[in-house]
Amino acid sequence: MAPTLARPSLSGVQFILSSPTTTCAATSVVTRAIAARSFSTTRSARDSVSIPPDSPNYIKVPEPPQSSEVRHPFVKGHLPIPRSIFPKKGVPEKVQSGYVNRIAPKSAAELAGLPPKSKQESWRRKMAEARRQSLEAGLQGLWQRKVKRDQKQAKESKARYLANKRAAQAPERLDEVFTRATIRESTAKNTFVPLDPEAFVKAEEARIKHAEKEAMKSEARRDAVVQLYVASKNFIVDEKELEEHVNKHFTEKIHNAGLWESGRSIWDSQKNPISMRELRNEFSGFNDRVTATTSAAVKTTVRQKNVAEELTGGKL
C-alpha cells in the first residue's frame, strides 16, 4: 500500500499565518502544502469552468441547510369544465322561491302533517329535508358566484375599453416627438400620397375587365373541348389502325414525291418553309402563286368558317 501524502495541520497553518515573524519562505511552503493535490492529469471542473461576473454563482452565498421554498406537487389530469346551469340572460327559475319544493316535493303524509310511523321514516324525512336545503343553498351560491363573476368581467372589460380609448386619443408622447427623425416640409409635400377620389370607380372598372377576361378564358376552354371532341373521330382506338399508320409513316419511301419519287426529306414531300418574301407578300395581300392562300376566296372561306363556328357554338 502506497504511503499517504503528508498534509499540514490546520492549527499549525493558522499559527504560522498569524505569527508576526512569518517569513516569505514559510508562507510559500505553507501555500505549496495547501495547494498539494493528487497525482492526476485530468483537470478539475473548477479549473475548466470559468464563471463570469454577471453570473449569480459568481459570489458564493451561503444557503440554509433546509430550503424554505414551497414546491407544490404536480397533479395529473385536468379538471372538468363545469356545466352552465343558468341561462345567459334574465333571472333563472332555479333561484326563485318554491323551485326546490317543486322538483323535490314532500310526501303526502308529510304535507298532511302526519307523524312518521317509524324511526326509518323519520330518518328518511330528515335526510330529504337536508337534501332540499343543500340543493337550495348550492343553487343560491352558484347564482351569487355567477353574478359576481359577470360583474367582474364587465368591469374589467369596460376598464380595458376605456384604457384603449384613452391611449388611442392621447396626444403624442414627448419622447417620441423628441426622438423622431426630422422631415422637411418640402419632402413631406412631395412624398405625400393623397387618396384617389376615383378609387371605387377604378375598382369597378377593374372588376368588369377581370370578369371579361375570365369569360374569354372560359369560352376558350369550351372551344378547346369542342375542338377535341370533333377531332376525336380521327383518333386511333384499336391495334389494327395503329399498325396501318405505323406501316404507312415509318417507311423509307415516306418522303418520295413528284413524278420520279426522288424525295429525300420532308421538304420534298411538303412545301418549303415560308420565306421572308412570302411573309411580306402575305402582309401586303400580294402573292404570285397559282394557289394563293391570301386570295379573296380563301379569306372569304375563313370568314364563313368563323361565322359558322360562332353560330353553332363550337369549332368546325
UniProtKB/Swiss-Prot annotation:
Q: Per the database entry, which stretches of residues form a coiled coil?
A: none
Location of the protein in the cell: Mitochondrion
Q: Which family does it belong to?
A: Belongs to the mitochondrion-specific ribosomal protein mS26 family.
Q: Name a GO CC annotation attached to this entry.
A: mitochondrion
Q: Which CDD domains match?
A: mS26_PET12
Chief place of localization:
mitochondrion
- Taxonomically, what lineage is the organism? Eukaryota, Fungi, Dikarya, Ascomycota, Pezizomycotina
Q: Show the segment(s) annotated as Disordered.
A: 41-71
Q: Which UniProt keywords apply?
A: Mitochondrion
UniProt-recorded name of the protein: Small ribosomal subunit protein mS26
What role does it play? Component of the mitochondrial ribosome (mitoribosome), a dedicated translation machinery responsible for the synthesis of mitochondrial genome-encoded proteins, including at least some of the essential transmembrane subunits of the mitochondrial respiratory chain. The mitoribosomes are attached to the mitochondrial inner membrane and translation products are cotranslationally integrated into the membrane.
> How is the subunit organization of this protein annotated in UniProt?
Component of the mitochondrial small ribosomal subunit (mt-SSU). Mature N.crassa 74S mitochondrial ribosomes consist of a small (37S) and a large (54S) subunit. The 37S small subunit contains a 16S ribosomal RNA (16S mt-rRNA) and 32 different proteins. The 54S large subunit contains a 23S rRNA (23S mt-rRNA) and 42 different proteins.
